[in-house]
C-alpha cells in the first residue's frame, strides 16, 4: 500500500476516534448505559406484564437506548482494535491487513454519520410519533389524485424506515383520489424526520384524466405534527369542544357504515377540527381524535412561537408554513425541493417513498 494511502488511513482513524469520544459526551453515553441496565432489569421481572402499556413503553425505551449504547460500544471497541492493528500492519508492511482495516473504517464512518445525524434533532418533540395531514388543493380530480399519491408516498416512506403507519381518516375524492387523509406514523424520531415535509407540494404532469393529454398543475398541502405524550402539558377545556358522531365512509369492510362510530371534534377557540374513523369502536375513535387534537394544539403553540421568533430575526428564511416547498415535474423527470435546491431525476423512486435526500438536506440546513 502506497504511503499516501497509509497516511490517509491513520488520519481517518484518529479523526473517527475523536468524533466517537465527542459523541459519547454529547449523547450522554454513561447515563444511557446505566439507564439501559435499569430498563433491562425491569423487563426481566415477569410482573412487568401486569401493566402492558408500561412494558411496551419500556420496550421502546430499551430499543432507543440500545441504538446509542450498543452502537457507540461497538464503534469504540472497533476503532481501538483498528488503531492497534494498523500500527502492527505498518511495522510489518502487511498490505492485506491494511486493506481489511480500510473496509472496517468505511463501516465506522457510516455508523458515525448515523449518530451525528441525530444531533440535528434539537426539537423536544423530534423523538415522538407523528400525524401527517394531507389536503387536496384546488383543481378537482387532478388535485385529489395528487393527494392520494402523496398518501402512498408517505406510507411507503414509513415502510422504508421501519415505522408503523396507520390511516386514521380519509375522505374520498369525487371521481378519484382523496380530498383529505390523516395518517399516524409511529417510530423513533418519526416527527423529527418528517416535520420538514410540512408545506405545499406542487405536481406538474400530463393528466391521465385529460383525454387531450394536456399538462396540468395541481397542489396538495401536507401538515406534520407530533403525537404529544404525558410529558407535554396541553390543557383542553371540555366546554370548548363540540363532538359529533357519524357513519364512517370509505374502505372498511361490510360493517363500517352500520353504526355512528366515526368521531369529529371541533375546538371552538382555535377552529381546529379533527376526525377519526379507523376503528369500529366509537370510544377508541374518540380517544384517538382527542390525542390528535392535543397534538395539533401543541404544534399550533409551537408554530406561534416560531412565528414570533421569525419576526425578530430578519435573517430567517421567508418560507412560511403554507408556502410551496417541493415541485414534482413528472414529464421532465424532475423533483426539486425549493428550500434546499436538492433535485432528483428518478421521480418514481421518490414517489415510492425515498425521501431521505430531501429530508436530510432540510435538517442539515435547519429548514
Swiss-Prot record:
This is Peptide chain release factor 2. Transmembrane segments: none annotated. Methylated by PrmC. Methylation increases the termination efficiency of RF2. The gene for this protein contains a UGA in-frame termination codon after Leu-27; a naturally occurring frameshift enables complete translation of RF-2. This provides a mechanism for the protein to regulate its own production. It comes from the Bacteria. The modification N5-methylglutamine is found at residue 254. The lineage of its organism: Bacteria, Pseudomonadati, Pseudomonadota, Betaproteobacteria, Burkholderiales. HAMAP family: Rel_fac_2 (MF_00094).
Amino acid at each position: 500500500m502506497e504511503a499516501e494511502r497509509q497516511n490517509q488511513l491513520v488520519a481517518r482513524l484518529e479523526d473517527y476516534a475523536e468524533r466517537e469520544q465527542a459523541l459519547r459526551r454529547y449523547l450522554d453515553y454513561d447515563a444511557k448505559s446505566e439507564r439501559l441496565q435499569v430498563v433491562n432489569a425491569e423487563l426481566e421481572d415477569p410482573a412487568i406484564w401486569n401493566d402492558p402499556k408500561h412494558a411496551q413503553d419500556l420496550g421502546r425505551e430499551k430499543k432507543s437506548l440500545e441504538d446509542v449504547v450498543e452502537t457507540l460500544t461497538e464503534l469504540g471497541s472497533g476503532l481501538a482494535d483498528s488503531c492497534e492493528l494498523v500500527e502492527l500492519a505498518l511495522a510489518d508492511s502487511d498490505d492485506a491487513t491494511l486493506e481489511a482495516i480500510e473496509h472496517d473504517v468505511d463501516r465506522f464512518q457510516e455508523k458515525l454519520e448515523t449518530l451525528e445525524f441525530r444531533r440535528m434533532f434539537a426539537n423536544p418533540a423530534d423523538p415522538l410519533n407523528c400525524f401527517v395531514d394531507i389536503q387536496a388543493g384546488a383543481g378537482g380530480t387532478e388535485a385529489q389524485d395528487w393527494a392520494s399519491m402523496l398518501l402512498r408516498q408517505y406510507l411507503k416512506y414509513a415502510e422504508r424506515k421501519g415505522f408503523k403507519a396507520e390511516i386514521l381518516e380519509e375522505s374520498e375524492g369525487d371521481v378519484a383520489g382523496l380530498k383529505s387523509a390523516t395518517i399516524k406514523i409511529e417510530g423513533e424520531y418519526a416527527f423529527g424526520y418528517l416535520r420538514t415535509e410540512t408545506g405545499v407540494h406542487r405536481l406538474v404532469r400530463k393528466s391521465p384524466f385529460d383525454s387531450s393529454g394536456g399538462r396540468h398543475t395541481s397542489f396538495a398541502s401536507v401538515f406534520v405534527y407530533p403525537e404529544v405524550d404525558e410529558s407535554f402539558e396541553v390543557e383542553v377545556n371540555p366546554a370548548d369542544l363540540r363532538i359529533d358522531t357519524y357513519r364512517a365512509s370509505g374502505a372498511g369492510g361490510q360493517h363500517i357504515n352500520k353504526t355512528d362510530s366515526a368521531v369529529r371534534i371541533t375546538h371552538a377557540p382555535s377552529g381546529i377540527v379533527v376526525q377519526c374513523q379507523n376503528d369500529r369502536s366509537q370510544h377508541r375513535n374518540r380517544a384517538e381524535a382527542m390525542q390528535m387534537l392535543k397534538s395539533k394544539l401543541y404544534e399550533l403553540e409551537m408554530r406561534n412561537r416560531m412565528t414570533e421568533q421569525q419576526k425578530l430575526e430578519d435573517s430567517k428564511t421567508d418560507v412560511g408554513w403554507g408556502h410551496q416547498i417541493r415541485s414534482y415535474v413528472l414529464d421532465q423527470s424532475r423533483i426539486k425541493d425549493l428550500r434546499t435546491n436538492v433535485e432528483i431525476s428518478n421521480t418514481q423512486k421518490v414517489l415510492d417513498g425515498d425521501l431521505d435526500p430531501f429530508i436530510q438536506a432540510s435538517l442539515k440546513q435547519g429548514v
